[in-house]
């Protein structure tokens, strides 16, 4: 790594997440307050020392936000919400920034339909935002789930699609006026 003495603003950055255990980074999401780092055991906010300040080799602070770890499913960002799969694979979490508490908080959005999630994992999902605000998720047994997520309208619902076949993957193709599944 490129490190000068004394430290320069363009030097490599290294930070230790003081969790007391080994954690594997699953994804890093840039947000207005700072970087959100999802590991297999928790989530962390990394800033330059204060919210919104630049991160540098001499200005870096990591604070744990949640004890719900993430799996390998890439997070989906919807407006100010980050949706991610839990490390154990049987639930989907919604994480967003609470400006009052100055912390990312989360809730289990799969709890409302836990029978669709118990003992299953999700190898793939895709966001079809327009026009119906759907998220398509493929379950490890080949069942396709759809998730309508309109948080600003306080509406979310899960359903499963009954077909004669099994799904192995899902993709969304953006078009001129809507996303195609």
Language-model segment annotations:
Residues 178-181:
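Short, intrinsically disordered, charge-balanced linker/junction segments flanking boundaries
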């Amino acid at each position: 790594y490129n490190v000068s003495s004394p430290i320069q603003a363009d030097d490599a950055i290294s930070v230790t997440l003081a969790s007391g255990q080994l954690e594997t980074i699953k994804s890093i999401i840039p947000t207005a307050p700072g970087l959100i780092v999802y590991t297999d055991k928790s989530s962390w906010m990394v800033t330059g020392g204060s919210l919104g300040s630049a991160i540098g080799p001499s200005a870096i602070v990591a604070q744990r936000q949640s004890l719900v770890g993430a799996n390998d499913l890439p997070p989906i960002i919807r407006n100010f919400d980050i949706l991610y799969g839990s490390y154990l694979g049987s639930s989907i979490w919604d994480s967003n920034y609470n400006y009052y508490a100055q912390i990312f908080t989360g809730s289990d959005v799969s709890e409302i339909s836990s029978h669709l999630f118990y003992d299953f994992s999700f190898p793939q999902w895709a966001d079809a935002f327009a026009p119906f605000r759907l998220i398509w998720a493929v379950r490890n047994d080949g069942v396709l789930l759809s998730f309508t997520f309109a948080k600003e309208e306080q509406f979310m619902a899960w359903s499963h699609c009954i077909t004669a076949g099994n799904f192995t993957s899902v993709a969304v193709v953006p078009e001129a006026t809507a996303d195609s599944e």
